[in-house]
Amino acid sequence: MKKSISVLRKESQIKNFISTIITNELTNANIYNPTVTDVVLSTDLGHVKVFLAFSSKENDGLDAVKNASGYIRKRLSKTLNWRKVPELHFYIDEVEKKAFEIDQILNSLKNEE
């Protein structure tokens, strides 16, 4: 199903704000070089899936961000001016790993020929 322009705009806003909050305001040592790769907003605007990539210590970084989700949601409520701020769900983005694995498989097939 195609997303409406307003949902895409809201996803973009959330992505920018969460990225700024995580990189500039969270001071946990386990959060090392985080990148918000994607944000998916549910159709009822009640839940947000936030996909993150870390340069190292992915699980520790994800746990630290999950622990700070209340703070992040509070900061979003102050900046978004929405009637209801969505609940945040954080996940590690596996796309880069999958792409690297596929690239290795293709290179090994190329070398076999």
Swiss-Prot record:
Organism: Mycoplasmopsis agalactiae (strain NCTC 10123 / CIP 59.7 / PG2)
InterPro entries reported for this sequence: KH_dom-like_a/b, RbfA, RbfA_dom_sf, Ribosome-bd_factorA_CS
Family: Belongs to the RbfA family.
Keyword Nucleotide-binding assigned: no
GO molecular function list: ribosomal small subunit binding
Name of the molecule in the record: Ribosome-binding factor A
Subcellular location: Cytoplasm
Main localisation: cytoplasm
Any matching Pfam family: RBFA
